[in-house]
C-alpha cells in the first residue's frame, strides 16, 4: 500500500507525525507531498521537508490530510488537493482526514462517506 500525506502551511504537526510513524511501523509506504515548496511550516513552527510536490504525486492507494489551523484552510483553497480527493473517491481509494481536515472537502459532491 502507498499512502500520500498532503501538507499545507499551518498543518498540525502531531497529526502528521503520528499517522506517518504508525503507518511506516506497519510497513506501509508513506510519502509527504506539499502544496508549496519545502520546507513547510506547521501550525506550531516545526518545519518539514516534504518528499515531493503535490504536482508529482503518482500512484497511491490512500490520501491522508492532517488538520491544523490554518492548514485545513490552505488545503481547501488548493484546487490540486480537491482534484486529488475527487480522483481518489472516483478510483475507490481511501481518503483519511484528521480533525478539521474534513472541512476541506465537505463542499464537494462526493459519495456517502464515513466520518469517524
Task: List each model region and its residues.
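Extended, subdomain-level signal for the structured scaffold at the beginning of enzyme domains
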Residues: 1-91, 103-104
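Intrinsically disordered, low-complexity regions enriched for glutamine and histidine
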Residues: 13, 112-113
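Short, thiol/selenol-centered motifs that function as redox-active sites or metal-ligating centers
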Residues: 98-99
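Conserved small/polar residues in nucleotide/adenosyl-binding loops
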Residues: 106-112
Amino acid at each position: 500500500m502507498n499512502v500520500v500525506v498532503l501538507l499545507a502551511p499551518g498543518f498540525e504537526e502531531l497529526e502528521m507525525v503520528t499517522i506517518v510513524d504508525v503507518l511506516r511501523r506497519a510497513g506501509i509506504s508513506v510519502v509527504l507531498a506539499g502544496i508549496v515548496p519545502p520546507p513547510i511550516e506547521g501550525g506550531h513552527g516545526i518545519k518539514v521537508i516534504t518528499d515531493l510536490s503535490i504536482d508529482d504525486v503518482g500512484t497511491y492507494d490512500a490520501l491522508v490530510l492532517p488538520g491544523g489551523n490554518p492548514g485545513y484552510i490552505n488545503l481547501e483553497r488548493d484546487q490540486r488537493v480537491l482534484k486529488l480527493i475527487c480522483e481518489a473517491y472516483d478510483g475507490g481509494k481511501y481518503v483519511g482526514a484528521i480533525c478539521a481536515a474534513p472541512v476541506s472537502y465537505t463542499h464537494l459532491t462526493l459519495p456517502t462517506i464515513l466520518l469517524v
